């Protein structure tokens, strides 16, 4: 499995490149540009615990894949996790798109708000990688 970190801001791509160790460079690649322009099996969504995909990167995904992505995610959250996908959990959602078939929803927050620490991002990343490995 290859992990691609995409950044539309050059400073972010530069920072990632500076902090990826040589060991990680075999499986982690940094790309400057949009993830939607690449041929990848899945994208990761940092949605919230209730699957609302109407802001930030999630809004871009909803625009690209269509509103059915949010609808599928919210249905899966209701049916598989009792109505809330906790930070540290992830779900694999079919996009319905011919090129990018999957979206891994791994919330970084329960409801939309700023993050005070890096822990939610760590937990979401861990959950997304585990979800991808299990697929």
List PLM regions with ranges.
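Macrodomain-like recognition of ADP-ribose-binding/processing modules
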Residues: 1-135
């Amino acid at each position: 499995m290859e992990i691609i970190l995409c950044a539309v801001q050059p400073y972010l791509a530069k920072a990632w490149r500076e902090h990826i160790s040589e060991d990680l460079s075999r499986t982690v690649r940094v790309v400057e540009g949009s993830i939607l322009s690449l041929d990848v099996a899945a994208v990761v969504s940092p949605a919230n615990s209730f699957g609302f995909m109407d802001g930030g990167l999630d809004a871009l995904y909803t625009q690209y894949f269509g509103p059915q992505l949010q609808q599928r995610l919210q249905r899966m959250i209701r049916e598989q996790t009792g109505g809330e996908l906790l930070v540290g959990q992830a779900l694999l959602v079919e996009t319905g798109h011919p090129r990018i078939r999957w979206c891994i929803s791994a919330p970084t927050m329960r409801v939309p708000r700023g993050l005070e620490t890096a822990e939610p991002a760590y937990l979401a990343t861990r959950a997304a990688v585990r979800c991808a490995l299990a697929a």
